[in-house]
């Protein structure tokens, strides 16, 4: 049976290069699955869990947005950041999210820092969601 080659690359380093039966990707319009022989395409990724399935075993990674290129039995994930969901400190993520929300209370939505804090809230919420989904 054909396999996918899946690579996850961030600006800092190559996180992963493995063979998989299927990849489930957090696309710009929702989750989508990729199996060998899939039609080539390019898509935006939203922050969320990228799940790889190999022989019935699932392994998930948090990806902080970016792009995914599918083609020739290969999935190339170009992520802003990525980490195994098993390494996510959920309590730490909740704390960072709450701190950012607290800082936002004293800001106008036109304040340049407001968008940065809002991005922190979205990212930490996505990390928590990815960790909880993978552990369920």
UniProtKB/Swiss-Prot annotation:
Annotated CDD domains: F1-ATPase_delta
Keyword Transferase: no
One GO molecular-function entry: ATP binding
Entry GO terms, CC: plasma membrane; proton-transporting ATP synthase complex
Protein origin, superkingdom: Bacteria
Gene3D superfamilies xref list: F0F1 ATP synthase delta/epsilon subunit, N-terminal (2.60.15.10)
Any Pfam family: ATP-synt_DE_N
UniProt topology in membrane: Peripheral membrane protein
Compartment(s) where it occurs, according to its Swiss-Prot or TrEMBL record: Cell inner membrane
Signal peptide: none
Subunit structure: F-type ATPases have 2 components, CF(1) - the catalytic core - and CF(0) - the membrane proton channel. CF(1) has five subunits: alpha(3), beta(3), gamma(1), delta(1), epsilon(1). CF(0) has three main subunits: a, b and c.
HAMAP family per UniProt: ATP_synth_epsil_bac (MF_00530)
Record-stated family: Belongs to the ATPase epsilon chain family.
Annotated protein name in UniProt: ATP synthase epsilon chain
Species of the source: Myxococcus xanthus (strain DK1622)
Lineage: Bacteria, Pseudomonadati, Myxococcota, Myxococcia, Myxococcales
Record gene name: atpC
